[in-house]
Amino acid sequence: DKPTTKPICEQAFGNSGPCFAYIKLYSYNQKTKKCEEFIYGGCKGNDNRFDTLAECEQKCIK
């Protein structure tokens, strides 16, 4: 059996990962029910990250 991964929009908000790049991306925040900017470190993290606010909202805001 494959482990079940949470849907992208239910994954942790703003997971920047262990690296030290400075990349502005957007992540869906379940607490505020909004897509918000965060800084991504460039590696690992999770799938709750989008290049644009519009892309995040299209995927996560119903």
Swiss-Prot record:
GO terms for cellular component: extracellular space. It comes from Bombyx mori. Pfam families: Kunitz_BPTI. Disulfide bonds join 9-60, 19-43, 35-56. The record marks 20-21 as: Reactive bond. This is Chymotrypsin inhibitor SCI-II. InterPro entries: Kunitz_BPTI, Kunitz_BPTI_sf, Prtase_inh_Kunz-CS, TFPI/VKTCI-like. Inhibits chymotrypsin and thus avoids the accidental chymotrypsin-mediated activation of prophenoloxidase. This enzyme is required by the insect immune system to produce melanin which is used to engulf foreign objects. Also inhibits trypsin weakly, this may be due to the presence of a pseudo-reactive bond in positions 44-45 (Lys-Gly). One of its GO terms (molecular function) is serine-type endopeptidase inhibitor activity. Transmembrane segments: none annotated. The record marks 44-45 as: Pseudo reactive bond for trypsin. Gene3D superfamilies: Pancreatic trypsin inhibitor Kunitz domain. SUPFAM superfamilies: BPTI-like. The lineage of its organism: Eukaryota, Metazoa, Ecdysozoa, Arthropoda, Hexapoda. Keywords: Disulfide bond, Protease inhibitor, Serine protease inhibitor. Residues 9-60 form the BPTI/Kunitz inhibitor domain.
